[in-house]
Amino acid sequence: AVYRTADVILINMPDIKLIKEDLKINIVGDYSFVDVTYVIQNNSYTDSKITYGFPIDYIRTDLQYEFEWQKEYLPEIEFYLDAKKLKIKHQVDYSIFEEKADTNDEQMLEMRRSWYIVDFNIPKGKSIILKVKYKIKNGFEDWATTKSFFPTFDDRRFIYDFKPAQNWDDGIIDELNVQINVKDIITKGGKVNISGLSFSESLGVYFASFKKYDLK
């Protein structure tokens, strides 16, 4: 992949509709395994060549200032179009911004955003299935990297942003399904705080489903 330092400008695609998004996140140990599947439809009268950017956000800590570029923070990322693997054209690094962990949290987290870029075509009047899979290390800072005399253990944090997908058509997804599996945390006696959407939970798996979900 080609690495660049810059920012990505998102362009509205009024004739390309995001029909469905299925997001599955499995949190195991210090890593989150993410599998997201999109059904995208070309409603225009011509074939559309798409340059697609997928953002991944890293929560920055003192440890990651030194090591965030190492492969251990994102050891795996793959794109598939209709089950055929796509080549990552290049990676664009990086935007630095601050964001709250959730709306009730006063703490601001410093984030780094990297964009992974692929090209694909959608024939006129047709739909495609785009899948993105990646493994990312959750943001945290533990006793080995702190300056405290006593060991301290920080929360593991993972953030997923739906907002970039608002540039498809009118920014409304016909169907959005989210599943977050935290069984590994629960069985080890850990606690989980999931915010942003309204979830139901069963045996350590959180579910949320929406129709006509507005990303704007």
Protein language model annotation of sequence segments:
Residues 39-48, 54-60:
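Asparagine-centered strand-capping/turn motif at beta-strand->loop junctions
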Residues 22-27, 37-41, 105-107, 117-122, ...:
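Beta-strand-rich interaction surfaces with strong enrichment in secreted/lumenal proteins
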Residues 31, 123-127, 203, 213-216:
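Solvent-exposed, conformationally flexible loop/turn segments
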Residues 10-12, 62-112, 191-207:
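Solvent-exposed beta-strand/loop surfaces of large extracellular or lumenal domains
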Residues 45-50, 74, 86, 173:
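Short acidic/proline- and small/hydrophobic-mixed sequence motifs that coincide with surface turns
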